């Protein structure tokens, strides 16, 4: 919902009930592509189904039966999934095969309204290509919790891009998560 832009406008005193100047997208009945179907991918699918999203999963190591048990549809070809998804959520390890997996060619194959979320590992998305894609309106937006260089370099152009929401690799920063981790 472009929360970062709304927040910025309200702080500037631009409180408008009809803020139609800021583009927003919703989750309801949209298509999400989950790349990587481990513990986090399985947790995410439950939330997506709550919004009646069409869920596609790309994970060459997980069977179609397992994915269908969770309510998803397995796809065999990442490129096919990228072309149709409204949201792309990455949940894979960084390896030689996954480094820069999402580059300019993959970004250019996506919908202009697509949003990418990466909470797995930095380096899976080519950050320069992502920044260019956002600036050129190749895709709509991104949410990143991980970066190729952590902490993120001060000269990283993503820091100045208002089409991306950034957080500091902070999945475990909630009080509830810290509590669970202390007993597991």
Please report, for each region that a protein language model flagged, where it lies by residue.
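A conserved FAD-binding loop/helix module that cradles the flavin
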Residues: 170-184
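Conserved S-adenosyl-L-methionine
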Residues: 50-54, 136
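Short, flexible hinge/linker loops that cap or flank conserved catalytic cores
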Residues: 25-28, 49, 108-109, 158
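Phosphate-binding beta-alpha-beta segment of Rossmann-like dinucleotide-binding domains, i.e.
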Residues: 1-31, 43
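Rossmann-like adenosine-cofactor binding region
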Residues: 62-157
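Glycine-rich Rossmann-fold phosphate-binding loop(s) that bind the pyrophosphate
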Residues: 37-38
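Short FAD-binding loop at a beta-strand-to-alpha-helix junction that anchors the flavin cofactor
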Residues: 157-174
